[in-house]
Amino acid sequence: MNIHEYQGKEIFRSMGVAVPEGRVAFTAEEAVEKAKELDTEIYVVKAQIHAGGRGKAGGVKIAKSLSEVETYANELLGKQLVTHQTGPEGKEVKRLYIEQGCDIQKEYYVGFVIDRATDRITLMASEEGGTEIEEVAAKTPEKIFKETIDPVVGLSPYQARRIAFNINIPKESINKAAKFLISLYNVFIEKDCSIVEINPLVTTGEGEVLALDAKINFDDNALFRHKDIQELRDLEEEDPKEIEASKYDLSYIALDGDIGCMVNGAGLAMATMDTINHFGGNPANFLDVGGGATKEKVTEAFKIILGDDNVKGIFVNIFGGIMKCDVIAEGIVAAVKEVELTLPLVVRLEGTNVERGKEILNESGLAIEPAATMAEGAQKIVKLVKEA
């Protein structure tokens, strides 16, 4: 689950991570009124969407007067902001964050992530702040420093100071930076985060260490422990199909292709998409129905896939372990009838009760194209979609 920058900064502030003063606004008039509450001569007007790259896309403006705040607010509100993370359609700006300007001396990057190679939380930092960290990793990887954190001990003060030294934080601000990083680590742990990232972290002319950005992703599996965080969810920023999928415990991510995929298991789903790509097709989604799919789940999965107007065919790839192939087959038949499917459909079943599952599909009288293997199924659906 993602949240807006201003919500992330409220969490930071509550846990001792230093941030500039700011206010959220939903209209240009409100933006001016909120700006009046800030003790500053420089205002930063920030578009609030669930995507990075807002600054480069024109979503962050520096205002030197209240009239400029109003001008920029009118310019941004209602705008479709297109960044490298939104896709060409962009995202509509519906709220703004009005923040105090500050005397920036230097920008840095810091982030806490989970390193799958070490199975540990890792602190990453660089003095190349304000730049996409992926770009830094590609061009100057030597400028990225890491500290692997012992889960028993947590982020040690010496690790925090070492990172601060390595990224050339001014000596007089080292202790403040170390305290800042330890507080940021506490946010990661106590809020069950999957990512906590600040780009940029800055040092100021007054010797302060501040977070000028706040990117926080939460572990969806831990949200039941954080009712307050659940309330921060902005459904308008999410794909309606993904919201609907979550109601039925389906893992769905929309993509840009035209072949809908329904698979059980994340690994098989990834392999299925790779195989479709290998044979010249383009997956329209990632959809994992999980290990306990029912007829109702399968029907809803079909409805969600068909909610994408770009879909021209569907590939169902099921390996029945805990989940039985005959149950899936019954669900497919019921779903195809209910949604009155007219698009090409290829189904590959393997595993428990597979022969009975195939019989159910064959006896249904529906236009379902069977496949014996994943490769065969991918080839068939790519061919059918291209011919459609």
Swiss-Prot record:
InterPro entries: ATP-grasp, ATP-grasp_succ-CoA_synth-type, ATP_grasp_subdomain_1, Succ-CoA_synthase_bsu_CS, SUCC_ACL_C, Succ_CoA_ligase-like_bsu, Succinyl-CoA_synth-like. Substrate binds at residues 264, 321-323. Residues 9-244 form the ATP-grasp domain. ATP binds at residues 46, 53-55, 99, 102, 107. Succinyl-CoA synthetase functions in the citric acid cycle (TCA), coupling the hydrolysis of succinyl-CoA to the synthesis of either ATP or GTP and thus represents the only step of substrate-level phosphorylation in the TCA. The beta subunit provides nucleotide specificity of the enzyme and binds the substrate succinate, while the binding sites for coenzyme A and phosphate are found in the alpha subunit. Heterotetramer of two alpha and two beta subunits. Belongs to the succinate/malate CoA ligase beta subunit family. This is Succinate--CoA ligase [ADP-forming] subunit beta. It comes from Staphylococcus haemolyticus (strain JCSC1435).
